[in-house]
């Protein structure tokens, strides 16, 4: 179990914010989005938060229970027409909540933009405004990085369930993994995110490697980008300016 981790991943503003992020990846009308895959991604995200021992608000667990209800009703055999109508209503109500939150968030962002424009004429400096925008952009991209790791961790869980082999426990430290990653990026300046985990089969090693990567990103030693929707995340070692 990993303790004393100083890295904090900026959380979503709430469960609806997370769901909106997941739904937005499909780039289609909210009410046309396939809901079951979204629910599965949400539940994987919640499980990964627990695995990384990151703080998780109770509202996320409440939403998780509601989503599990919808998913279970989807998987159950059709009983009556009323059952189908009730399930569809639950799904519609959820998507309506997400859509309403989307409108609220757009309005909030518009108001924030107006506030920043007005700040040009008052006390806030141009440098401060640019810094704020950079942080917001980085946080949004970091969420995609975290979700990508969630998928890797979920795949590893499935492999453990299918494998009855007992493996002796090993200890992995963030410091060791930082050293290992630095060596890798010295030899190979650019690599795929998934390549960092392709040869790792133990959950503790996966988690420790991810935490080490976050430390390198936090210290601006490594940058990352995603060229297209659902595309591969690319990691690149940053040159240290003297």
UniProtKB/Swiss-Prot annotation:
It is found in: Cytoplasm. The keyword Ribonucleoprotein does not apply. GO terms for biological process: cell division; chromosome segregation; DNA replication. Gene3D superfamilies: 6.10.250.2410, Structural maintenance of chromosome 1. Chain E. Keywords: Cell cycle, Cell division, Chromosome partition, Cytoplasm. GO terms for cellular component: cytoplasm. Its main location: cytoplasm. InterPro entries: ScpA, ScpA-like_C. It comes from the Bacteria. NCBIfam families: PRK00104.1-2. Component of a cohesin-like complex composed of ScpA, ScpB and the Smc homodimer, in which ScpA and ScpB bind to the head domain of Smc. The presence of the three proteins is required for the association of the complex with DNA. Participates in chromosomal partition during cell division. May act via the formation of a condensin-like complex containing Smc and ScpB that pull DNA away from mid-cell into both cell halves. Belongs to the ScpA family. This is Segregation and condensation protein A. The gene is scpA.
